[in-house]
Amino acid sequence: MCGIVGYVGSEQAAPILLDGLARLEYRGYDSAGIAVVSPRHELQVKKTVGRLKALSDLVHGGADVEGTIGMGHTRWATHGAPNDVNSHPHVSENGKFAVIHNGIIENYVELKEFLISQGVTFKSETDTEVVAQLLEFYYNECGDFFESVGRVLRRIEGAYALGMLCADCPDRIIAARKDAPLLLGFGEGCSFLASDATAIIKHTRDVVYMDDGEIAVLTRGGIQLYNAMQQPIEKEHHHIEWEVSAAEKGGYPHFMLKEIMEQPDALRHAIAPRLRGGEIVFDDLKLTPEKIRSFDRIFIVACGSSYHVGMVGKYNLEHLLRRNVEVALASEFRYSDPIVDDKTLVIIISQSGETLDTMAALREAKKRGAYILSIVNVVGSSIARESDDVLYTWAGPEIAVATTKAYSTQLAVLDMVGLCFAKILGTVREEEYADAVRELALLPDKVKETLGHCEDIQKYAAQHFHHESVFFIGRNLDYALGLEGSLKLKEISYIHSEAYASGELKHGTISLIEDGTLVIALGTYGPLFDKAMSNVVEVKARGADVLALTTESHCGEMAKTVDHVLTVPDTAAMLLPSLGVVPLQLFSYYIALQRGCDIDKPRNLAKSVTVE
C-alpha cells in the first residue's frame, strides 16, 4: 500500500526521491515525506499530509534539502490519523535514526510500553515509530547500526518493508523485508530501494527482489544482501523489460483510459505466444499431464477484480474440466479451514503478485499439500516466486488503481488454462476446443472493435451520471461480469452499485427498483438470453431505466424493450466476459469523469494491498 523509495549515490537525493514517489502515486496515499542525510551527517526530515505536490513545494523541488543519500515514503494511514506527525519518515528521540515502513507491527503496543518504561518519549500514534525508537535503544547498547537492526527484527512481529538511516553511518541505507514487497536496484556508483520497480526504472533496470527475512545494506559501491541469520548471500538479478514510457500517460488524460485502450495489445501479448497450430501451448508450465489428471478439486483464490476473474473461471472451468471448482476470497480462505490436499490445484490470481491476503492463502494451501499455479502480471513478484508454477499475463505496468488490462489478461490466461487442461483430460469436444482457440486468436481485434463504441458510451454516461444507485443484473457468466462492472463503477465514481444474479430479483432485490432506477442488464450469454429478457421486462415494468449489454446478434431483440443497448461482437460463449467488460470499464470511466472524480487515484483505495 505505502510507497517506498531510497537512493545512495553521488547526485542530490531529494529530486530523485520526489520523482520516485511521483511514480508511486498510483498506489494511493494520504501523506508523504523524505529523509536525507546532510553533508554534515545530520538527518533532514521533511513531511506533510496531502498530495505529493505539497511536499515538493515545501522543499522547492528538493533544492532545500542537500545530500546524496536518502529515503522517501508515501503513506496510507493504518495506525494514527493522516497528519504531519504520523507521516513517515519517523525519527528516533535523539534524531539519530530515520525509518520508513510499509506493513503493520503487530506487537507495537507491547514494545512501546517497554520503551516508555525506559524513558523514551513518543511523538506519534504510529506503529512505525516503535522501530525508530527501538533502533536507537539498541544502538545505545551496542554502537553498531547493522547489529541494532538485527536486534530490532528479532523483537518486532508482523509485516514490514523497512528502510533505515543512521546519522552515524551516513554512507548507507539498511533495508529489511517480511510479508511486504521490497526490491533493490543496482546502478553505476549508486544503489536504489523501492516498493515497486516503477519508482526506479528511470535509473536502472537491474533489480533484485528481496525475500522474507532478508536484510540489505545499500552503499554507493553496491548492495550486500544477508539472510535472516545475518549471513551474506548472493541472489539472481532480474532485468526489467518494459519501457519507462509504459508507466507514463502517453497523451491520455488518465492512466485508466490509456490502460483500457491498451487492452488489444495486452491481450495479444498474453495470447499469441501461447497459440501454435490451433493448439494452446504453455512452454512456461511445469505441470505434467499426469499431475493434471491427479487433481480432483480446484480452488481459485484471489481478491477484488482478480476474484471476479475467478468467478468467470469457475463457470468456464467446471464446464470444460468436469471438476469441482471453488472460488474463494483470499482474505477468507486462510481462515475457513478449506478442504485442500495433494490432489487439489489452487490457482492464485494477482496483478501485483504481492497482495498480502493472497500470499497468506497461498502459504496455507501449500502447507496442506496443494499444487500452486499462479497467474500474475509482475515478473519476479513474491507470489510468482513462491508458487509451484506461474503463468505471466505480460500486460505491462498498470498504474491506475482500478484494474482494466490486468483483469482482461488474467481472464484470457485462465481461459487458456481451462482449454489446455480440458484437452489433456479429454473433457472438451474437439469442435468446441477448436472454436474457442480460433476466437482466442481473434479476441484482441474484437476488443479493439468494441473500443470503437467510446462515443456512444460517453453520451450515455453524460445522461446518467447523476444516479446515486446503479444495479447490474445477469445470469451465469453475465452475473460474474456484472460483479466486475459494479466494482468498477463504485470504486472510481463513488456511486453505490450492486450486482445481482437475475434469478434472485424476486427474492428481495426487486423491491429496490422504482421509477428512474438505473439497471444495467447483461445479456451477452446466448444460452440464457431469453431468461435475461424476461428479467429486463420485470424491471422495466417497475419503472427502471435499462441500459443493456448484449451481442450484435441479439441487439435487435433487446432494443425493443430497453432504453439503450451497447453491443459486443459475437464470440465463443466462454470468451464473452472478455469483450463485455470493455464497455463496462468505459461506462465507469466516463461516469467518473462527469462527476469530477480522481479517476486514477480513488479515495481510500490502494493499488496493491500489502496489509491485512
Sequence positions of predicted segments:
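Hydrophobic alpha-helical scaffolding
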Residues: 7-10, 101, 121, 138-142, ...
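Gly/His-enriched, cation/cofactor- and phosphate-binding structural elements
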Residues: 11, 30, 38, 222-224, ...
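Glycine-rich, anion-gripping cofactor-binding loops and their flanking helix/strand elements
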Residues: 183-208, 305, 331-365, 506-540, ...
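Generic C-terminus detector
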Residues: 230, 545, 571-612
